[in-house]
């Protein structure tokens, strides 16, 4: 079926927090919960993304809209290993941009400077350590800044 999805150009988006919160609610024991393992579908050419659309509402009564957190939650629940972490970050950045046909996506001269700077060294670290956003830019203008945590000796 995965090859058919890829061949038809069908993209798949998973909402990890909502899926986990809503699944199994109809049972009184053996609450089966999970998410579609879309990181495995990437290998067959399916464009997959991770997102959240239900925050602080009846479908998901918690959350902070962090897509890095969704990538981390997905990696945990779908048993994605360290070699998949980069793909998990892609599924909240470049892959949704492709799904939305954002041709001007990416960091290159002449493209809109819309980006978030994370406190990490690698894409894998962003997902595994829930990297904190330090700066955000929209159209080349800083839209927010956040100081990095400083640890002091006791």
Label each PLM-derived region with a short phrase.
Residues 14-23, 33-118:
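His/Asp/Glu-enriched, well-ordered alpha-helical/loop segment
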Residues 26-29:
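Short glycine-enriched, charge-decorated loop/helix-capping segments at active-site entrances
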Residues 109-154:
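C-terminal cap of metal-dependent C-N hydrolases
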Residues 2-9:
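Acidic (Asp/Glu)-rich catalytic clusters
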Residues 1-2, 106:
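Acidic, amphipathic alpha-helical patches
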